[in-house]
Design a protein with these regions (language model features):
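Structural alpha/beta surface segment adjacent to cysteine/selenocysteine redox centers
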Residues: 1-77, 143
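C-terminal cap of thioredoxin/glutaredoxin-like
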Residues: 1-10, 14, 65, 70-145
Length: 145
């Protein structure tokens, strides 16, 4: 997707930090109504996949809309992630704490919806064309020179 394309276009110039902000009341107390059921489980699964170097691979599958339990299990298996290990990891309080800390960081940054991309602190809200990302990145790179 967009992040892969940007990393390829700007080798060694970008640092990507992902913060979880699941739109699911099961773990996100900032939501007033349900939006994406199973998003909290998906966020915990992504944290666990990161521990095996598979964060982006799993995230790509999850962002394609595959967050129900059966699809999540199939995605983990497709990536050769051990079911028992991943299930145990997702159930750990430390894993939930990672997601909770990300939600808190997003809240402090004023983020209330996703996706939001911060480029040197400048927000780009919602799905945007690649050209818009490039324009903002190029501006920031010029300022850094």
């Amino acid at each position: 997707g967009t992040i892969k394309e940007l990393l390829a276009a700007y080798p060694g110039q970008l640092r990507v930090v992902f913060r979880h902000f699941p739109l699911d009341q099961a773990c996100n107390p900032l939501l007033k109504r349900p939006v994406h059921e199973n998003a909290c489980a998906a966020a915990r699964a992504a944290v666990c996949a990161a521990g095996r170097g598979q964060f982006w691979a799993l995230a790509e599958k999850l962002f394609a809309g595959n967050t129900d339990p059966e699809d999540l299990l199939a995605a983990r298996r497709e990536l050769h992630l051990d079911d028992a290990e991943q299930t145990a990891c997702a159930a750990r309080p430390a894993t939930a704490a990672v997601v909770a800390a990300d939600i808190a960081a997003c809240s402090q940054a004023g983020i209330t919806a996703v996706p939001v991309f911060l480029i040197n602190g400048r927000p780009l809200r919602g799905a945007r064309p690649l050209a818009e990302f490039r324009r903002l990145i190029d501006q920031e790179l010029q300022l850094a020179r």
